[in-house]
């Protein structure tokens, strides 16, 4: 088959002219038969200095294609071809035409810089991470020592800061399962809560300690001192204040301890006598009924 590249004696209208009619270029089935057309296409491309993309040879398999060359533009290809086929139709463009827009280049560099900042992983050995881990462990120990549960802490924080705080939040913080940013924010809040909780606990302990100091601890009396007190009780069950003080000095005991011992001993003696009298009365009654 013969090739008919152009009409009008192989002349064409320059791209910068005002003519708007397209110049039809008919490609044939064989690449060898279309060599003249390729030469004219090369001439067209050499004058199109304003293009920013190359156009491949316009045949795909055995399907003929027609491309219109408009004033200053070329219709892009419909299909995407492999890179090694795009070099057959036209010579490569000059490097200035392929240069990237400076504005776009700066934008891409800025985007890459921001992406790097966002995606940059946190150093797990940094002082901030170690400090956060140490606080989480100390917080758990001090919380348990104060007698608070994770639910107690979550409810206390939710009442002040909002419903986003819960038992799950405290649990994730203690187990280091929050993001670094959220954990740092929560650390400041928990530090304040822990400070107030320990102040309340200190006041409570002072109150309990004062009540405990009011109660005197139980005094243990040795066996020898008990024997001496029993002898004094057998002689006189109700000693005077001077006698109690003298016995306390002899036995190396407090006066109040000796006084309380004699009171308790008299009460026990009274209970024994009452129980004995009731037993004797019951025996006498039964003896009389048997008669």
From Swiss-Prot:
SMART domains: HOX, POU
Subunit note: Interacts with PITX1. Interacts with LHX3. Interacts with ELK1.
Lineage: Eukaryota, Metazoa, Chordata, Craniata, Vertebrata
Key words, A-Z: Activator, DNA-binding, Homeobox, Nucleus, Transcription, Transcription regulation
Main location: nucleus
Domain POU-specific: 124-198
Similarity section: Belongs to the POU transcription factor family. Class-1 subfamily.
Gene: Pou1f1
GO molecular function: chromatin binding; DNA binding; DNA-binding transcription activator activity, RNA polymerase II-specific; DNA-binding transcription factor activity; DNA-binding transcription factor activity, RNA polymerase II-specific; lncRNA binding; RNA polymerase II cis-regulatory region sequence-specific DNA binding; RNA polymerase II-specific DNA-binding transcription factor binding
Organism: Rattus norvegicus (Rat)
Function: Transcription factor involved in the specification of the lactotrope, somatotrope, and thyrotrope phenotypes in the developing anterior pituitary. Activates growth hormone and prolactin genes. Specifically binds to the consensus sequence 5'-TAAAT-3'.
Ranges annotated as DNA-binding: 214-273
A biological process from GO: positive regulation of DNA-templated transcription
Notes on the domains: The 9aaTAD motif is a transactivation domain present in a large number of yeast and animal transcription factors.
GO cellular component: chromatin; cytosol; nucleoplasm; nucleus
Stored Gene3D superfamilies: Homeodomain-like, lambda repressor-like DNA-binding domains
Protein name in UniProt: Pituitary-specific positive transcription factor 1
InterPro entries (alphabetical): HD, Homeobox_CS, Homeodomain-like_sf, Lambda_DNA-bd_dom_sf, POU, POU_dom, POU_domain_TF
Extent of motif 9aaTAD: 5-13
Superkingdom assignment: Eukaryota
Compartment list: Nucleus
